[in-house]
Amino acid sequence: MKVRILTLFPEMFNGPFGTSILKKAQEKELIDIQCFNIRDFALNKHKKVDDYPFGGGAGMVMTPQPIFDCHHHVTQMLNLNEPCKTIYLSPKGSTFTQEKAMELAKEEQLIFLCGHYEGIDQRIIDELVTDEISIGDYVLTGGELPAMVIVDAITRLIPGVLSTEASYEDESFHCGLLEYPHYTRPRAFNGLEVPSVLLSGNHKDIDMWRRKQSIELTFERRPDLLKGLQLKKNEAQWVAELSKKKE
Ligand SMILES: CC(C)(C)c1cccc(C(=O)NCC2(NC(=O)c3cccc4nocc34)CCCC2)c1
């Protein structure tokens, strides 16, 4: 997969993309991530990339020309015969989910456009953006961190990026439930023990315990995730008992 990121702050990406799994994925050529500084494409003498909003109001808006020319340069270099999926990170976008990550992980190339200030000129969105995606409802300073989140979520889904055992952490493995509690050595830490079932070696009991923990945790903290799930009879019984307790 080729990922191209259009941003005013390419240096922000050095940490996350220069570390651990994302770094290794690039070294293994499973993903090719390149950042482009929109400011390099500004034609005005002072390399200005923002201007006052027509109609007045607080804040500044990113001007269309540098973004348009940067996007044109990137699409030329990708040398495609059809327009490239161009994702604008935006609070107005559809909320990013694991399902969306799995959908995007199938793409051959993706362009991410990161806004700044109050946002970008609408004409860019109308002409170049194919998808607007949001990572959640809070105010941020720019679209860069959302772009990193989405690239992280997508990259780990590319075959070969995660070692086989790690890839079982996928939603399909837990089928959308919150994860059971994790424990590792030592068996006693500050006088705190590990649940004995996990030390029993009885994998049927362990799997049952973990499944019950996941269902109870999901019921308590994210009942919305439970709604869409197919539970076995005994599991549905657990949920019914939890609901009764809650009444
Ligand atoms: C209702 C609520 C969501 C709180 C809201 C209303 C109005 C503005 C803002 C706001 O944050 N504007 C600033 C910018 N925000 C984001 O880019 C951004 C923010 C959040 C999630 C995201 N996922 O991708 C990009 C995201 C837009 C231009 C530069 C940064 C947020």
Swiss-Prot record:
Location(s), subcellular: Cytoplasm
Record function comment: Specifically methylates guanosine-37 in various tRNAs.
GO CC annotation: cytosol
Subunit structure as annotated in this protein's UniProt entry: Homodimer.
Keywords (A to Z) from UniProt: Cytoplasm, Methyltransferase, S-adenosyl-L-methionine, Transferase, tRNA processing
GO MF annotations, alphabetized: tRNA (guanine(37)-N1)-methyltransferase activity
Primary location: cytoplasm
Gene encoding the protein: trmD
GO terms under biological process: tRNA N1-guanine methylation
Enzyme Commission no: 2.1.1.228
Stored InterPro entries: Alpha/beta_knot_MTases, tRNA_m1G_MeTrfase_C_sf, tRNA_m1G_MeTrfase_TrmD, tRNA_m1G_MTases_N, tRNA_MeTrfase_TRMD/TRM10
CDD domains: TrmD-like
UniProt: S-adenosyl-L-methionine binding residues: G115, I135, G136, D137, Y138, V139, L140
Catalytic activity, reaction form: guanosine(37) in tRNA + S-adenosyl-L-methionine = N(1)-methylguanosine(37) in tRNA + S-adenosyl-L-homocysteine + H(+)
Gene3D superfamilies: 3.40.1280.10, tRNA(m1g37)methyltransferase, domain 2
Family: Belongs to the RNA methyltransferase TrmD family.
Alphabetized Pfam families for the sequence: tRNA_m1G_MT
Enzyme class: transferase
Name of the protein: tRNA (guanine-N(1)-)-methyltransferase
